[in-house]
Amino acid sequence: MSPHENPSVETRTESDTFGPIEVPAHRYWGAQTQRSIQNFKIGTERQPAPLVHALGIVKQAAALVNKDLGGLDPKIADAIAESAAEVVAGKHDDEFPLVVWQTGSGTQSNMNANEVIASLANERLGGKRGGKSPVHPNDHCNRGQSSNDTFPTAMHIAVAREVQERLLPALSHLHTALDAKAKEFESIVKIGRTHLQDATPVSLGQEFSGYAAQVALGGARIAATLPGVLALAQGGTAVGTGLNAHPEFAERFAAKVAELTGLPFTSAENKFEALATHDALVFLQGALTALASGLFKIANDIRLLGSGPRSGLGELSLPENEPGSSIMPGKVNPTQCEALTMVCAQVVGNGTTVSFAGSQGHFELNVFKPVIANAVLQSVRILADASVSFTDNCVVGIKANTDRISDLMSRSLMLVTALAPSIGYDKAAEIAKTAHKNGTTLKEEALRLGYVTDEEFERVVRPETMLAPSAE
């Protein structure tokens, strides 16, 4: 909130190249952050916390590298690094109030970090909150940097950390649960379905093994995009040339970030590409969208197989977690499936946002950076959270309704497929169509038509033998 909107807030005067401006006295931010608060009253979406923490990593690493290169007084550099470490730890999240909808380079958020960290460092060195002495937001915290390379670097750091520390473990958790169900259900034979119609048999375990494989492959595709995300733009400064940065800064900076995060970050080979495009994040979002597609299918299958309890497919019983209706007593809904599919719908929408925003690299700079960062980070976070929720509150508690599965299996006309190799497709189709028309069983019609004997039918039409290739 602007101090002008709340006169009771005590203020101090800060200044930038536009002149003086009043800032809440208890806040660590300065003039440029305050101007952004006043100029961009758009929505409620603040810069994501992982991005704020990543900006802290950038400032911490830059200060330490600049100290090593002789570009910063050691006392100032250490004060900046220590203050930035507090930002990384989330101790000052409430000092980062800026919304996503700001300048497309993220300049205001970069300056928000510079101002807060400089203010913290000034207090460390015996100075006062705010101001520009002894630590200056631009001259010291932003030394050898531009918003144009700092913000994309923070984007990559934030996304890589979230994928590595949050999403991939969540997918592993889901995969483990689905794989356990595949093994638990491996001996339960059920009717398969294609085009929403009866098909030949599968085991329930085989069906779940497909889900498990889909999750594993989705995670692998996401992991395969990380090398591009681990390449950092820092050192390109304003347009990719590296103006005002030490020749060794970029490589040393990437190594320092790798040391601080434990992730193998590198310096981007071509800084012009790293500033003007966000293809690496578009690529990652594509993999996230593919994962969302797969998770939607899995959740949809499970809720359909659990439909009922008396008038649906009813092959599965899903955990009953909460009442499902305010008007229908006793109704329970597949809420975890619904939550996951809504997450997937959001991620698919984010894919459209990121693809379009990624195309907006006009000349030397893409200026849709904050919306790309927000969309990708949201995709990663909600996919991770939903995967854990779906696992813990649904998948682990799924039970097979074996009586219902057996009943549906015994009435399926598609078991006739097993007869096709011996009597031919046309005769097998005739048996199925006649049984459907007359309301009789396959066996009754096969014997009446004289195409097989009782012994032949019993030997061939056995669902448990129809789950794998056969030489017979």
Swiss-Prot record:
Q: Where does this chain mainly localize?
A: cytoplasm
SUPFAM superfamilies in UniProt: L-aspartase-like
Annotated site (Important for catalytic activity): E338
Is Cytoplasm among the key words of this record?
yes
Q: Which PROSITE patterns match?
A: FUMARATE_LYASES
Which molecular-function annotations from GO does this UniProt entry contain? Answer: fumarate hydratase activity
UniProt-annotated binding residues for substrate = 105-107, 136-139, 146-148, 194, 326, 331-333
The alphabetized UniProt keywords are:
Cytoplasm, Lyase, Tricarboxylic acid cycle
Main EC class of this protein?
Answer: lyase
Q: Which reaction does it catalyse?
A: (S)-malate = fumarate + H2O
Question: What miscellaneous comment appears in this entry?
Answer: There are 2 substrate-binding sites: the catalytic A site, and the non-catalytic B site that may play a role in the transfer of substrate or product between the active site and the solvent. Alternatively, the B site may bind allosteric effectors.
**Which family would the database say this protein is a member of?**
Belongs to the class-II fumarase/aspartase family. Fumarase subfamily.
Instruction: Please describe the quaternary structure of this protein.
Output: Homotetramer.
Q: What does this protein do?
A: Involved in the TCA cycle. Catalyzes the stereospecific interconversion of fumarate to L-malate.
What is the protein name for this chain?
A: Fumarate hydratase class II
Q: Please name the gene that encodes this protein.
A: fumC
